Amino acid sequence: MSYPQGYLYQPPGSLALYSCPAYGASALAAPRSEELARSSSGSAFSPYPGSAAFTAQAATGFSSPLQYSSDPAGFPSYMGSPYDAHTTGMTGALSYHPYGSAAYPYQLNDPAYRKNATRDATATLKAWLQEHRKNPYPTKGEKIMLAIITKMTLTQVSTWFANARRRLKKENKMTWAPRNKSEDEDDDEGDGERVKEEQSEKAQDCNETSAEDEGISLHVDSLTDHSCSADSDGEKLPCRATDHLCESGSESKEKYDDDEDEEEGDEEDRVLPVKPATSSPLTGVEAPILNHQQDGSPRNSNKTSLDNGMSPSSQTPASKPKLWSLAEIATSDHKHSNLGSVLSSATSSAAHNPSYPSSSLLGRHIYYTSPFYSNYTNYGNFNALQSQGILRYSSAAVTANEGLNQTVLSTSSMHKHTSDSVRTASNQLDQHYRPTNFESKKDPSEVCTVGVQPYP
């Protein structure tokens, strides 16, 4: 490798690292002056016979791969002096093209290499094409021969023939029969046409397979939907068969309508049973599973309170039916403000909320003290009726019914007793599903003091 004219070449002796001592125990023990004197003849990384590293290796018995009898010259014999480029040696190095190599026959600056086809080259190709008008498909050997004659590459020759055939097709001068490309021929046009045809066929196949896959996926989705629906129905059936505790608001309403049609015939013979509140008509969220096995005594005591403690609203004319509306519940607090002394023991836990009187416990339906109702109104929860957010009928209903019995005894002279308890209970169930905005302004005197409201 040669260097340019103005390049300052430094011999290996001047590139020695004077600050880096040679490696080895003897080198460390050697005098500093001798090391500096010997370092001028060799580098620390390629030790020569005069360096300290070479003497250390020789002392330990290792032979150096660079065994010179004397100091080597700055340049080998085949290289000339860098400062005299025109002397003997590599005189032609400066004129050699740096991008050329022996493996590439046509150099970039070689006049034999033709970048663009000239008229002479195309004239040769046209002459061959004119002779082979009936079969303008040159073989591999013919292409190589034409490439050598025209000094073009095989790619250029193949491209020129493909363009010539395409041009003749457009000019309707096609004098040959189209044929398939043989194995030993390199036809660009045939390749392009076949690639296009194969791509179109593959696209059609992909469309068909995608349609089939979509059909299969749709079939699988439908099967999974049916199976999921069947599983969900199977899960819902035992809940519906055993009890009403897993029904939502709309389902319980529809089931209540069906049950009401069946029970209309024998309403006069038996008393309509009171069902626990299982879901909220406002939210549609499933209510928590209640401890309904311990509801026997509250329900039995509630029947007597229903017989004796019905409000005048159920006995008034039909122009003002009873309605459990939010406005009526709000006004019920003022009606029962005089019952605070009687119910002080039952509502002692609600005394922490000063905004609501202590007598509002019985003025409000027990169902509306559920955890779901406080999310949609401004009424707070009652800790006496809730234990960790779950409505407990086993303890709350008993306390409420005890207060109800006292209220009924104290106010029995003010109300008219009724013997038709079935009719009043059914009226309450029918009026329970009326819209809440119906008769928003209700007389405060028309308030029912019933404990557990029957709700399907």
UniProtKB/Swiss-Prot annotation:
PROSITE patterns found in the cross-reference section: HOMEOBOX_1, HOMEOBOX_2
Name of encoding gene: irx2
Disordered: annotated span: 172-214, 246-320, 434-456
Entry keyword Transcription regulation: yes
GO annotations of cellular component type: nucleus
Organism: Xenopus tropicalis
Subcellular location: Nucleus
Tree of life domain: Eukaryota
Residues annotated to bind DNA: 110-172
Any GO MF annotation of the entry: DNA binding
Tissue: Expressed in the neural plate in overlapping patterns with other irx members, which all share an anterior border of expression. Also expressed in the placodes. Broadly expressed in the tailbud rhombencephalon (hindbrain). Outside the nervous system and at tailbud stages, expressed in the developing otic vesicle, branchial arches, prospective heart region and pronephros.
This protein's record includes keyword Zinc-finger: no
UniProt feature, compositional bias: Polar residues: 291-318
Matches recorded under SMART domains: HOX (SM00389), IRO (SM00548)
GO biological process: brain development; cell differentiation; dorsal/ventral pattern formation; negative regulation of neuron differentiation; neural plate development; positive regulation of DNA-templated transcription; positive regulation of neuron differentiation; positive regulation of transcription by RNA polymerase II
Protein name: Iroquois-class homeodomain protein irx-2
Keywords, in A-Z order: Developmental protein, Differentiation, DNA-binding, Homeobox, Neurogenesis, Nucleus, Transcription, Transcription regulation
Functional note: Acts partially redundantly with other irx members in neural patterning. Required for formation of the posterior forebrain, midbrain, hindbrain, and to a lesser extent, spinal cord. Acts early in neural plate development to induce expression of some but not all proneural genes, and specify a neural precursor state. Also up-regulates repressors that prevent neuronal differentiation. Patterns the neuroectoderm in both the anterior/posterior and dorsal/ventral axes. Probably dispensable for pronephric kidney development.
Family per similarity comment: Belongs to the TALE/IRO homeobox family.
Chain intervals with Basic and acidic residues compositional bias: 192-205, 246-256
Predominant location: nucleus
Compositionally skewed regions (Acidic residues) per UniProt: 257-269
